[in-house]
């Protein structure tokens, strides 16, 4: 199982969301077995991160060693804009 670490901004966003329990559950599933949610996971082109689809939300994450870094949680439309 991977250790989950959230960016500070992600924690603030997560507290405001109605679907926070569902999103946290999916993140925990991903940490337990990164291959279990394969159909909802896609590697982002030209970036080191991947995305996890949770209904209309996108969880942007990366795995470094034994750590699952949650970099951002965004609504579907703005998840793929280049920063």
Where does each model-flagged region fall?
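Enriched for short, Lys/Arg-rich terminal
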Residues: 1-4, 9-17, 22-24, 31, ...
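A short, surface-exposed loop/turn module that caps and links secondary-structure elements
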Residues: 28-53, 80
């Amino acid at each position: 199982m991977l250790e989950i670490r959230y960016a500070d901004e992600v924690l603030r966003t997560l507290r405001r969301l109605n679907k926070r329990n569902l999103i946290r559950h999916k993140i925990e599933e991903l940490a337990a077995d990164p291959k279990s949610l394969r159909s909802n996971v896609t590697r982002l082109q030209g970036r080191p991160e991947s995305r996890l689809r949770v209904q209309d939300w996108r969880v942007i994450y990366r795995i470094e060693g034994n750590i699952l870094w949650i970099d951002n949680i965004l609504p579907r439309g703005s998840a793929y804009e280049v920063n």
